[in-house]
């Protein structure tokens, strides 16, 4: 199979974690079994990601607090502190859906081989570009979006990888996902502009004499008051904290996804799969593979040529160097079923087997996504396929609690510093 693991895997530990709290213990356990250089690489990579989130925090602070500070609805320091707290809560409670939506902009070949030198170079290139641009725009006071920056760096890495590996640019980036996210980034400000403008026009028409239309200077000159009316002030404060919370749940997840890429690249044995998965979750994954095989055979008339069902069969073998090819789907399913047969705990699998299982799952999910876009597949079957994809990835799309807390702290503290 393709190269596995990271340098230093299996060496005796040169970095011994001290005993600590239950939350920090899993984080410090990272370094057990790693030699000094691999441990330092891990520290450097994690520092890069957390630095990106820290910069993201102070870079985007103004988005949430500018209105409440300008209108005197809140004192500046209190507004920034509360914004940081709500950013922190947004990361903690936001889940990991956005995290993996961003990660899957990368081509599947890079994702299944992220534990190689090229995969690690990809992560450092993305982070270096995003950090440099965010710092530069912040320093010169240029409005910029951290999300646009990160997505642009991901697309750049995907295209560079396509050029280096002699594959077409069409395959070098997950363009379907890129278009979806790009449309969201374009539509969001337009929708915000239209909704906000519409509400303003309605309020000006229905309540033309309301105090809410006065600027802070006008209110101070006319009413000798510096704060907005109570209800307007309450709405401003709630909306600012809501923006902070949503920013945390959205932008914070990007950091979670990046940290998971780093962990999978440097210490793959511990993070390629969620080793805390329950027996039920593993059974769901194994059953999804069986149902996926049945699904493809059930729709052989539509999918037979794309998946090479007539030639592949369950008896075919995978090539020695694994690659994600739709025509190897049935052998991939067979290999996955063989690796998971009788498994009730991922910890029982060897490190190499866990890496293989992740590769198979990511490849099958990517192929299923392509199958769902084919013409001739009934809507009901597409819905079934989508559910199977969710079951396949339930133990690969996750994040440990310490990762979420670390990103939440970096983003929240960065917001307060901003």
Task: Give residue ranges: language-model regions.
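Residue-level signal for short hydrophobic patches within transmembrane helices
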Residues: 40, 44-55, 82-85, 238-249
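Glycine-rich, mobile lid/loop segments that gate access to catalytic sites or pores
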Residues: 143, 151, 155, 159, ...
């Amino acid at each position: 199979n393709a190269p596995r693991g990271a340098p230093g895997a299996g060496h005796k530990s040169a970095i011994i974690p001290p005993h600590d709290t239950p939350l920090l213990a899993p984080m410090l356990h990272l370094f057990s079994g790693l030699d000094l250089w691999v441990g330092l690489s891990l520290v450097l990579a994690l520092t890069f990601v957390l630095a990106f989130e820290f910069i993201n925090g102070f870079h985007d602070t103004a988005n949430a607090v500018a209105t409440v500070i300008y209108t005197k609805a809140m004192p500046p320091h209190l507004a920034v502190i509360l914004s940081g707290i709500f950013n922190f809560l947004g990361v903690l409670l936001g889940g990991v859906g956005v995290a993996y939506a961003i990660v899957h902009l990368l081509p599947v070949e890079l994702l299944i081989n992220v534990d190689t030198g090229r995969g690690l170079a990809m992560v450092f290139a993305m982070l270096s570009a995003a950090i440099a641009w965010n710092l530069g725009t912040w320093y010169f006071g240029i409005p910029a979006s951290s999300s646009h920056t990160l997505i642009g760096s991901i697309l750049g890495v995907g295209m560079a990888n396509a050029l280096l590996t002699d594959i077409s640019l069409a395959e070098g980036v997950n363009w379907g996902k890129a278009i979806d996210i790009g449309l969201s980034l374009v539509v969001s400000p337009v929708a915000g502009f239209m909704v906000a403008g519409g509400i303003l026009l309605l309020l000006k028409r229905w309540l033309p004499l309301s105090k809410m239309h006065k600027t802070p200077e006008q209110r101070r000159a006319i009413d000798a008051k510096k704060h907005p009316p109570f209800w307007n002030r309450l709405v401003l404060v709630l909306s600012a904290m809501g923006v902070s919370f949503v920013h945390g749940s959205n932008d914070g997840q990007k950091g979670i996804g990046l940290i998971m890429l780093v962990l999978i690249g440097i210490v793959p044995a511990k993070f390629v799969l969620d080793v805390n998965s329950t027996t039920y979750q593993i059974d769901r994954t194994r059953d999804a593979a069986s149902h996926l095989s049945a699904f493809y055979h059930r729709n052989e008339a539509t999918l037979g040529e794309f998946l090479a069902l007539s030639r592949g069969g369950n008896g075919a073998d995978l090539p020695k160097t694994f690659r994600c090819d739709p025509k190897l789907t049935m052998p991939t399913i067979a290999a996955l079923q063989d690796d998971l047969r009788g498994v009730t705990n991922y910890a029982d699998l060897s490190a190499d087997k866990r890496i293989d299982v992740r590769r198979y799952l990511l490849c099958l999910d990517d192929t299923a996504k392509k199958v769902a876009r084919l013409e001739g597949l009934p809507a009901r079957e597409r819905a079934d396929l989508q559910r199977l994809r969710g079951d396949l990835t339930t133990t690969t799309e996750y994040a440990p609690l310490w990762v979420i807390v670390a990103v939440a702290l970096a983003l929240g503290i960065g917001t307060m510093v901003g």
